[in-house]
Amino acid sequence: MLGMSLREAAAVLRLGQVKPTELCQKCLSLIKETSFLNAYITITEDIALKQAAEADKRFAQGKPLGELDGIPIAIKDNFSTAGIETTCASRMLKGYVAPYNATVVQKLFDQGAVLMGKTNLDEFGMGSGSTDSIFGPVRNPWSYSRSYIEKRPISHHAAKDDSDWVIAGGSSGGSACAVSAGTCYLAIGSDTGGSTRNPASHCGVVGLKPTYGLVSRHGLIPLVNSMDIPGILTRCVDDAATVLGMLAGHDLYDSTTVQDPFQPFSLPETIDLSNLCIGIPKEYHAPGLSTEILSLWSKTADLLEKAGAKVMEVSLPHTPYSIVCYHVLCTAEVASNMARFDGLEYGHRSDIDDSTEAMYAATRREGFNDVVRGRILSGNYFLLKQNYEKYFVKAQKVRRLIADDFVKVFNSGVHVLLTPTTLGDAAPYLEFIQEDNRTRSAEEDVFTQCTNMAGLPAVTVPAGLSSRGLPLGLQFIGRAFCERQLLTVAKWCEKQMDFSPLQFNRDLGNGSIVLQYSKSASFV
């Protein structure tokens, strides 16, 4: 049952075949057995069992709260949760307990969701591997799949403490790992430049970044206010659509959310692509793109065309400038947002108290890692009086040009864009950490950050396995607030790929995980 989709599990609960407490206990057991993956920072066992028991009572009375009632979920540890520690994987917030729930968290609780725990991430969401956390890196569960183990150059099977495991992606790596490993049916991540879609692609799950303003950011500890958006990680596109319907809508606590009411939708079972135009951006043939991703991208475009969709090459001419533009704007907002962590009101406070200035400096030196401090320094540099026009203002203008590129393409009749999500499959951890964080992020975010700067919806769908037996994802980008159309196309492609999730098998020992995949989800 742990390999089911959210909607399948919900149906089993409604039929009374399994009780929410039984399902909760199964997930908690699996979390403990796969603890070496380091997906969770905090496991909320007592809270989960209490919430599941309450769901038991509602089902016994025939009054479930909704489709999420009794369903195990996980929340990225940069969302505020009342009474539960929210650390952002940083010493700066270790021990911090928020007095309120983030809006998305509260909406899930209102639907009866059962919280398994808070998931691991790069410190404050600044990274693309989930390797820069004070709680240690997240391991991709596919590191322990038969498909990967059998393709390794070494002959022996992996142990939990070996060095051959691959990264989960980031910064929402813990959330992607939790869903992929079967410890929950839904995880919430955040997406500033690809932080939901990148790990979803590497872990073989669906990752949805909604249109900016469609889902409330209230309670999401901010990184880049103008780009941050809660992300949804599930095992299938239908589940992502279901959850979006629960989370979307105006929030009085977030003035950037749209005023118009959101109409939840379900995706059709029979999908007709004959009236759709799919765009293939030529600028996304980026340096470093693996031949496997390129082949998968091309094959998927052919499948869409054979199904009746019009497929055409399009141009987004300012794409080559986007990653530099993103870096300038991202670090500038980071510098502003991180100023609130000064040791005065909450979070870590240094013992050095010779003066307020000394305490403030020591607190930030002790509380932030090198990556966070580096981004703060970069952002403050771009915001200096002598640099403001030269860098920050110019980057804002380029951002507008990037957004206009998308507007022109969509106004030309294109409905959805098909692109890679990442340059390749997940890198081995020891190889990944050889590069500095900024270089890694530039490489990993190259296909994803444009949609954050343009505020557009995007979803990554698992599309196949690499020659190393690791997941490869493809990204679909839609028009603003056209999530239904976007997810309909994504669901059609998902059906063609028939990608199967990982299934945990205790018989193999060492926390091994085996993959049961169908013929169409084989190696590219």
Swiss-Prot record:
<comment type="subunit">
    <text>Subunit of the heterotrimeric GatCAB amidotransferase (AdT) complex, composed of A (qrsl1), B (gatb) and C (gatc) subunits.</text>
</comment>
<keyword id="KW-0547">Nucleotide-binding</keyword>
<keyword id="KW-0436">Ligase</keyword>
<comment type="function">
    <text>Allows the formation of correctly charged Gln-tRNA(Gln) through the transamidation of misacylated Glu-tRNA(Gln) in the mitochondria. The reaction takes place in the presence of glutamine and ATP through an activated gamma-phospho-Glu-tRNA(Gln).</text>
</comment>
<keyword id="KW-0496">Mitochondrion</keyword>
<comment type="similarity">
    <text>Belongs to the amidase family. GatA subfamily.</text>
</comment>
<dbReference type="GO" id="GO:0030956">
    <property type="term" value="C:glutamyl-tRNA(Gln) amidotransferase complex"/>
</dbReference>
<feature type="active site" description="Acyl-ester intermediate">
    <location>
        <position position="195"/>
    </location>
</feature>
<dbReference type="InterPro" id="IPR004412">
    <property type="entry name" value="GatA"/>
</dbReference>
<feature type="active site" description="Charge relay system">
    <location>
        <position position="76"/>
    </location>
</feature>
<dbReference type="GO" id="GO:0070681">
    <property type="term" value="P:glutaminyl-tRNAGln biosynthesis via transamidation"/>
</dbReference>
<dbReference type="InterPro" id="IPR036928">
    <property type="entry name" value="AS_sf"/>
</dbReference>
<dbReference type="Pfam" id="PF01425">
    <property type="entry name" value="Amidase"/>
</dbReference>
<protein>
    <recommendedName>
        <fullName>Glutamyl-tRNA(Gln) amidotransferase subunit A, mitochondrial</fullName>
        <ecNumber>6.3.5.7</ecNumber>
    </recommendedName>
</protein>
<dbReference type="GO" id="GO:0032543">
    <property type="term" value="P:mitochondrial translation"/>
</dbReference>
<dbReference type="GO" id="GO:0005524">
    <property type="term" value="F:ATP binding"/>
</dbReference>
<feature type="active site" description="Charge relay system">
    <location>
        <position position="171"/>
    </location>
</feature>
<dbReference type="InterPro" id="IPR000120">
    <property type="entry name" value="Amidase"/>
</dbReference>
<keyword id="KW-0648">Protein biosynthesis</keyword>
<keyword id="KW-0067">ATP-binding</keyword>
<dbReference type="InterPro" id="IPR023631">
    <property type="entry name" value="Amidase_dom"/>
</dbReference>
<dbReference type="GO" id="GO:0050567">
    <property type="term" value="F:glutaminyl-tRNA synthase (glutamine-hydrolyzing) activity"/>
</dbReference>
<dbReference type="GO" id="GO:0005739">
    <property type="term" value="C:mitochondrion"/>
</dbReference>
